[in-house]
């Protein structure tokens, strides 16, 4: 009997739950198609592990990054959520606001300028996206 350790590279924009689903499907397929395999451990990665591990060792954690983003975030209404992507030794931030909180185009231009200055001064953050949601529909049970 064998134990299998597999690494599957995926698009960095998939959700955590989709990554988990890919891992479960991969595990099931290997077990069903190889009777000599007793168990499979599937790692879902967005980058090559060796490259990712060496580049991401010096990136700050979420709380530190949110503090670093404070100069920009303080100019916005309270975000509904902030999503951080650790890619290539840098960080991409997605900030989600409701549409009604951020409809003024003059305010939008001011924030765009602040984001441009922030990115120029902070090379760790490779991009910062501000997303507007018109409405969040409730989850049905």
Give a label for each model feature.
Residues 1-141:
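Peripheral (non-transmembrane) domains and long loops of multi-pass membrane proteins
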């Amino acid at each position: 009997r064998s134990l299998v350790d597999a690494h599957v590279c995926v698009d960095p924009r998939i959700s955590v739950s989709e990554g988990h689903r890919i891992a479960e499907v991969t595990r099931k397929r290997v077990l069903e198609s190889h009777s000599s395999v007793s168990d499979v451990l599937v790692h879902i990665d967005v980058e090559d592990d060796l490259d990712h591990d060496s580049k991401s060792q010096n990136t700050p954690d979420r709380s530190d990054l949110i503090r670093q983003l404070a100069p920009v975030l303080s100019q916005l209404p309270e975000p509904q959520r902030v999503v951080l992507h650790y890619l290539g030794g840098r960080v991409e931030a997605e900030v989600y606001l409701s549409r009604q909180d951020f409809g003024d185009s003059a305010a939008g231009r001011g924030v765009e300028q602040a984001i441009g200055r922030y990115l120029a001064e902070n090379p760790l953050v490779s991009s910062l996206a501000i997303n507007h949601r018109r409405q969040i529909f409730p989850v049905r049970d």
